[in-house]
């Protein structure tokens, strides 16, 4: 079974996003990752991965205590399912300004584990003015942030016994497939 975890953008969603997120005007739409000023390594196109269900974490940052760091290994693609993209819907002002965040401590721990990518089902690992600097900080450490994933609940619910697999189509647009 294959599970598509990319967000499909409708014309209405693109219009709404452009009205609520200035970066949407320059291709910062839908499921994507920002290469920042780095080169995306080809070996990153196939990685083991894990999806952590952190959907019960509300009104605070997602922290290191919310996941089992022992399950995270070097070069892994680590995803976080919050349900926010399904609950709020993509493109609203709230979607871009009140989304969940990963704590700086958790991000540092993931960088220390030398993961290759971090995926989230919301607009960014940090909000507002911290968003772009954290994406750059992670990229400087060889880690790319994949934003606006959807359907991660299907991956969590599928109880995958084998590692998550995915395929990157381009550096600007991402189509992630997980093998179950």
Each language-model region and where it sits:
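Active-/binding-site microenvironments in catalytic and ligand-binding cores
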Residues: 1-180
């Amino acid at each position: 079974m294959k599970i598509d975890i990319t967000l499909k953008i409708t014309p209405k969603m693109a219009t709404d996003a452009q009205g609520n997120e200035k970066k949407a005007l320059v291709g910062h739409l839908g499921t994507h990752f920002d290469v920042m000023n780095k080169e995306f390594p080809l070996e990153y196109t196939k990685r083991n991965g894990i999806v952590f269900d952190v959907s019960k974490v509300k009104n605070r940052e997602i922290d290191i205590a919310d996941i089992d760091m022992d399950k995270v290994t070097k070069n892994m693609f680590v995803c976080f399912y919050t349900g926010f993209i399904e609950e709020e819907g993509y493109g609203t002002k709230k979607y871009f300004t009140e989304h969940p965040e990963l704590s700086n401590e958790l991000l540092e721990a993931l960088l220390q584990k030398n993961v290759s990518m971090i995926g989230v089902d919301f607009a960014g690992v940090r909000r507002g003015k911290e968003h772009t600097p954290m994406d750059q900080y992670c990229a400087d450490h060889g880690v790319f942030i994949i934003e606006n994933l959807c359907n991660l609940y299907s991956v969590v619910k599928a109880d995958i016994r084998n590692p998550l697999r995915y395929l990157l189509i381009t550096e600007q647009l991402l189509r992630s497939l997980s093998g179950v």
